[in-house]
Amino acid sequence: MSTVGNSTNIFWQESPIGKTERQKLLNQKGCVVWITGLSGSGKSTLACSLSRELNNRGKLSYILDGDNLRHGLNKDLGFKAEDRVENIRRVGEVAKLFADAGLICIASLISPYRKDRDACREMIQNSSFIEVFMNMSLQMCEARDPKGLYKLARAGKIKGFTGIDDPYESPLNCEIELKEKEGECPSPVAMAEEVISYLEDKGFLQNE
C-alpha cells in the first residue's frame, strides 16, 4: 500500500499509452520551457511569440501564464512566501503533465525563488526542463511597466512586489539567457527564434 501526501490508499494508475507513443503521434518531444524574470521583462511577450512560431512549424504547445492561472487553478493563493511556493509547485505539476502528454509546455511566471524553480526542474526531469531567464534590468522593466504595477509598488499600494521589496533570485545555470540590448527588450520574434534554435538543436522538434 502506498501513502501519498495527506491521502492514503492511493495507487498510481498506469496509462495504456505511454509518452513515447504520444510523442510519435505529434512528431515532437514533450518538454517544459520555463520563462522566468521580473514583471515587465517580456515573459508573456516571449511566450506568445514562441507559441505562434511553434504553431507555424506545426508543433503543438500550450502556455501556462502565471496571471491566468491565478484566475482559476491558483485563485485561492495570495502572494505570501508560502503561497508563492505552492503557486509554483502547482504550475510545475501541471507543466509536467503537459510534457508527459508530448506537448511543448511554455510556463511564463516571475517564479522569483531559485529553490522553487529547481524543485520544478527535478520534478519534470532535467533533460526536459528548459529554463529561460529574461535578464532585463529593473530599470528597463520599471520603465516599461505594462501593467502599472511598479508605480503602485513604489507608492506603497502593493506590498511584497518582486524587485522592489521582495527579492528575485537569478538562475545560476539556465539553458537560455535573454538580455536587453541598449536598454531595450529584444524583439518578440528574435527571442522566440533563439528558443526555437535551442529546441531544434536538442531534438525537441522532431521525434527520433
Predicted regions, residues:
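ATP-dependent NMP and nucleoside kinases share a basic, alpha-helical "lid"
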Residues: G72-D83, E93-R154, G160
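Small-molecule kinase domains that catalyze NTP-dependent phosphoryl transfer to phosphate-bearing small molecules
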Residues: N135-E193, Y198, K202-E208
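The conserved Walker
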Residues: S39
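Conserved substrate/cofactor phosphate-moiety recognition/catalytic segment
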Residues: C48-K96
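Extreme N-terminal, non-catalytic leader segments
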Residues: M1-V32
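Conserved lysine of the Walker
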Residues: K43
